[in-house]
A protein has these predicted regions:
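A cross-family "folded-core" feature that marks the main globular domain of proteins
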Residues: 2-281
Length: 281
């Protein structure tokens, strides 16, 4: 998409300018060097900027970003714009522009905490790697980039958090919603281990399959998608594997309670099959 010429209202730094246009009373343009040597009243042609230019048009996001650049180093802002471009290029997807706020804010203040000697933990790290393998791999590369460019070594815990931001941005889902779904999955896993008296191997293929099923089950319930299963199969599972079947219904109760949406009966069949596979090992 070709961006039109804009008139600069204010230069926030060399990489961030507030502009206006006939069709956009106010827009924040982000791009390395876009504000260099510019002042209010100057015209800016995004096509003349070597690096990719991003737009923030949502008023709330504009307000959040203005506040963010008051506290974040200008070079870091420019570096994060490179990171966002790297994510788009690597995934071949457009990203939700909120990532400029969410990921920048998260990483900048995480590095501050690390400098102060504070520990960063992520109890859901293995699950995140299993649920979002592509995003996780990309997050590992971003952590390497940060180490190479900024000489800051982020802990492995951060790979998981960055992966969630990437997933949120590439699927246009609120990162809080993504985190909430992961918490529900974590609660379900704890319930499975308690009810079935098993300790699941977090590195096993069966566990990864279960996590993927739970992820899509939670997403289906959240969006109201129906899932059906033959009643004859459900009847056999109920009779042959009563503990797994009753546990499946308990898990559905967790989803219904946490998501405040009804869970289709068909989910019980597929959950029971996964649980039976776990207990038969």
């Amino acid at each position: 998409m070709t961006l039109p010429m804009y008139t600069i209202k204010k230069v926030l730094n060399n990489s961030v300018v507030i502009c206006q246009h006939d069709t956009d009373p106010e827009v924040i343009l982000l791009g390395k060097g876009i504000g260099f040597g510019k002042k209010a009243g100057d015209l800016v042609d995004p096509a003349s900027v070597p690096e990719k230019v991003y737009q923030l048009t949502d008023k709330e996001e504009q307000s959040q970003y203005r506040e963010l650049v008051k506290h974040v180093d200008e070079d870091f802002i420019a570096f994060m714009q490179e990171i966002v471009g790297f994510i788009e290029t690597s995934t071949g997807k457009k990203v939700d522009q909120h990532i400029h706020i969410g990921l920048t804010d998260h990483l900048f203040f995480t590095m501050k905490r690390i400098e102060q000697g504070m520990e960063v933990t992520n109890p859901f790290l293995l699950e995140t790697e299993s649920l979002y393998p592509n995003e996780y791999s990309l997050a590992e590369r971003i952590v390497d980039m940060i180490h190479e460019r900024l000489d800051v070594l982020l802990p492995d815990a951060e790979i998981g958090f960055i992966a969630l931001h990437i997933h949120s941005a590439t699927t246009f889902k609120n990162v809080l919603e993504v985190n909430r779904h992961n918490q529900i999955i974590g609660q379900i896993v704890q319930t499975i281990e308690s009810r079935l008296n098993v300790k699941m191997d977090r590195t096993s293929l069966d566990y990864k399959r279960l996590l993927r099923h739970l992820r899509y089950a939670v997403e289906r319930v959240a969006t109201g998608e129906l899932v059906e299963a033959p009643q004859k199969i459900e009847k056999v599972l109920r009779e042959e594997y009563p503990l797994c079947y009753s546990t499946a219904w308990e898990l559905m109760g967790i989803m219904e309670r946490e998501l405040k949406r009804p869970v289709p009966r068909g989910e019980a069949t597929y959950l029971t099959m996964h649980l039976q596979r776990l207990t038969s090992r």
